[in-house]
Amino acid sequence: MELVAVKDDQVVGLIDIEYDTEEEKVVSEEEKGGMIWHLAVHPDFQGQGIGKALMERAVEEAIKQNLEILEVWTRDAGNSADWFEKNSYRKVDEYYHLYLSDEDMAHSVQPGDKALHPLYMFAEYTGKDIEQFDSIERKYKCMCYIRNL
């Protein structure tokens, strides 16, 4: 499902949701659901209820499709986590994205093969001891939110 918000002939927001099908499950929970891949409102139009209106319309459509939940993953940047909680979502999971630079790699990654020279690394950390990565500049908490319909 793709919905757009238009104001004065200009697209100012959008939401994109993929539904579970018989052939493919897109949400992590057992219930039949939809994954919100994108929800965006143009910065000049934020704070006017456009995102909430898009979400509520998407919920109406999801219910018509007999979905039981909506799932979304977001990073801790900005206020998106608070926004989802205020809009009836609950956090069910989290992990971290780690981006290691050459310098980070030199201090933390020791390949067994001396001919292997990693230059850059992306990793997902699902453990609980994130403090061990305090020296890594680029790390982001990724959070999963679920809304029951």
Report each predicted region and the residues it spans:
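Conserved catalytic-core motifs of GNAT/GCN5-like acyltransferases
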Residues: 73, 90-139
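Residue-level recognition of the GNAT/N-acetyltransferase active site
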Residues: 37, 42, 46, 75
